[in-house]
Amino acid sequence: MAFGWHSMHGSIIWFLQIAQLSTAISHDQNATAVHFLISNLFFLVSTGALWFELCAIFCDSSSSTSILSTSLLMLNYFSLKFSATGERHLVATNIAHIEAHTSIVGFMISLFTPLKETIITKYEMLVRT
């Protein structure tokens, strides 16, 4: 009887550890995605983006479209900022910001690869002019 209880207890402990690990990973991924959206949201608000544009982005039913729309809005802002002030480092910072977040959250990699290429292409075009 003691062996059966010990075996069952070990299985329960193992199951609980796996459940805790799974929950922690899920929370980390969600927190990273939420942090990315919130940091971009406050950045956009602080740079003068219109509230109705933000509502249109975040009220979208597709979260992947919302993330992409937010980043495209940032890209448009950086393009305007670059042409107005000639600050190339802002565009480079945006590229590094997107690369850092795509390496953390796996499902964002496929979403941001075309966007990253667009940013790099746009940056190269602006540098040449």
UniProtKB/Swiss-Prot annotation:
Q: Coiled-coil stretches, from where to where?
A: none
| Keywords, sorted A to Z | Membrane, Signal, Transmembrane, Transmembrane helix
Which locations, inside or outside the cell, does it occupy?
Membrane
Organism's domain of life? Eukaryota
Transmembrane stretches in the record are: 38-58, 95-115
> One GO term of the cellular component aspect?
membrane
Question: How is this protein positioned relative to the membrane?
Answer: Multi-pass membrane protein
Signal peptide position in this chain? 1-24
Additional information: Partially overlaps HRT1.
Q: What is this protein called?
A: Putative uncharacterized protein YOL134C
Q: Which organism is it from?
A: Saccharomyces cerevisiae (strain ATCC 204508 / S288c)
